[in-house]
Amino acid sequence: MAFSITVPASTANLGPGFDSIGLALNRYLHLEVEQASKWSFICSSPGLENIGTDNLVTKAATFASKEWGKVLPPCQVVMKNDIPLSKGFGSSAAAIVAGIELAASVCGQFASKAEKARLASLWEGHPDNVAASIYGGLVIGTHSEESTEILHVEAPNIDLVALIPSKTLATKKARAVLPDMLSYKEAVQASSVANVLAAALVKQDWELVGKMMLADRFHQPYRQQLIPHLPDVCAYAQADEDAYGAALSGAGPIILCLVKEGKGEAFASRLHKQFPACRAEVMRPAVQGSAVSIAQA
């Protein structure tokens, strides 16, 4: 059986929605899969030319198949990827989701989106990126060892402009600068900001979304030491008439700006002139989540 898997990229957090809020993006990981006598991966995409068989796709596929009590047969995989690696667009999450989709297909296992999100969250430790890649659109979720709850909201009609530096940033390094704990007072304030962000996203009150992204207390104040231009970019987006605001995308270093629909190209041009060391790329939210297509005989 031959089939293809397509998984969208994602951005997470949107400021204070730390490890909870995710948005699917129109950049994709694409796999062409066929059962074979042994595992093999072929990829010519930048950074993945020498990918071996011991990778996140096979690890997640093995994990899922074991959870289902199935035997995972080897496959030949031809991979194409246009999600930037280690930049904050959920490249690892997309690989995890692709692995779960692969396992479900080759093992003949039906799995709902909720079940896939549960498995992916167990592997990843948080639901934001993986759930966005599975459902598409916007997701707000919570995860523990006992349960995973995901609220799915349709993709918003806005433009997105990503400010992309040349350097990468490992998630492990970005998490290392976070505090071990917040005081009760700090946690209450940070939580209230996140609550308003979630409500504003659901109501599509984009002015309020931008304001709340800037008010994050969970991670951006600590991570700006790794991305020194973050405050300047956020201030620039907040002041621009076509932008609602900006936030670190996931762990960074990409900074994602939320922009009025149809204004992305013009804003991206201005943003690049202001921050010429980075690339400004116009994007859109991805409406559809991960999908599997069976090849026609």
From Swiss-Prot:
The pathway where this protein functions is:
Amino-acid biosynthesis; L-threonine biosynthesis; L-threonine from L-aspartate: step 4/5
Q: Where in the cell is it found?
A: Cytoplasm
What molecular functions are annotated in GO for this chain? ATP binding; homoserine kinase activity
Domain of life assignment: Bacteria
**Which keywords does this Swiss-Prot/TrEMBL entry list?**
Amino-acid biosynthesis, ATP-binding, Cytoplasm, Kinase, Nucleotide-binding, Threonine biosynthesis, Transferase
Q: Which Pfam families match?
A: GHMP_kinases_C (PF08544), GHMP_kinases_N (PF00288)
InterPro entries, A to Z: GHMP_kinase_C_dom, GHMP_kinase_C_sf, GHMP_kinase_N_dom, Homoserine_kinase, Ribosomal_Su5_D2-typ_SF, Ribsml_uS5_D2-typ_fold_subgr
Q: List the disulfide bonds.
A: none
Q: Which reaction does it catalyse?
A: L-homoserine + ATP = O-phospho-L-homoserine + ADP + H(+)
- Provide the GO biological process annotations: threonine biosynthetic process
Keyword Metal-binding belongs to the record: no
Give the enzyme class.
transferase
**Where does the chain bind ATP?**
P84, L85, S86, K87, G88, F89, G90, S91, S92, A93, A94
Keyword Oxidoreductase on this protein? no
- Record-listed E.C. numbers: 2.7.1.39
State the GO CC annotations: cytoplasm
> What is this protein's function?
Catalyzes the ATP-dependent phosphorylation of L-homoserine to L-homoserine phosphate.
- Similarity comment: family membership: Belongs to the GHMP kinase family. Homoserine kinase subfamily.
Official protein name in the record: Homoserine kinase
Q: Which organism is it from?
A: Shouchella clausii (strain KSM-K16) (Alkalihalobacillus clausii)
Gene that specifies this protein: thrB
